[in-house]
């Protein structure tokens, strides 16, 4: 009977927690809206008055993985919603955010997410000037082409970085796809730019990538604070793996020790797949099969 009572209490607490969570919008808490407003203000300074900036957020994930926003879109908005768009008008320094509409059925399983219906809340959390559904974006783009001079449209011409990704590795992957005669994959950014040029040929398309790259090199105090926290977690994970090392352990088990420390302390995952190499495997700088003996490890 005691076991049944405990299970019932836990079940009721779980249900109550789940019901409370349904009314909470999922949003990052590391940066205030002023941080993103400041970044967008610097973009306006770089592109000038006769320009618009159009940024495409990451698509939804396939399969049972957690969505992660692209680095570039998150850097300017903090928004972690799939299929979002950002439009910045250099003429009047206004910013419009475009989100999908609420999917009540999906939210019953995944929790409440930012949507086009959450105007006041989204503006408060992100500091943007306007919120619209994504279907409004084509109409708003056409407004810039009613009369010349037409503004220059800035967007990403390089692949956007996602979870555990870097641009050099993404470019290597695209090069491999191009060399495969059976793989006709085109980068999502390439398809987006082609769509812009087809639908709105009056726009001169320019690359936003160098501007964001230069901005992201210089870290704000809040970014430095997060980097220090992540570095401390990396050190804690390495120390835990070292303490756990003993004869007979496999590489993947040591990898799991460090990852446990990351996750239990609030990290969403690794910056990259750990390099946990033992024996002769340690000679390979980016080895990740994790099935040898003596260990050389890199975690982040």
Regions found by a protein language model. Name each.
Residues 107, 116-118, 246-248, 273-275:
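Juxtamembrane/interface motifs at transmembrane-helix termini
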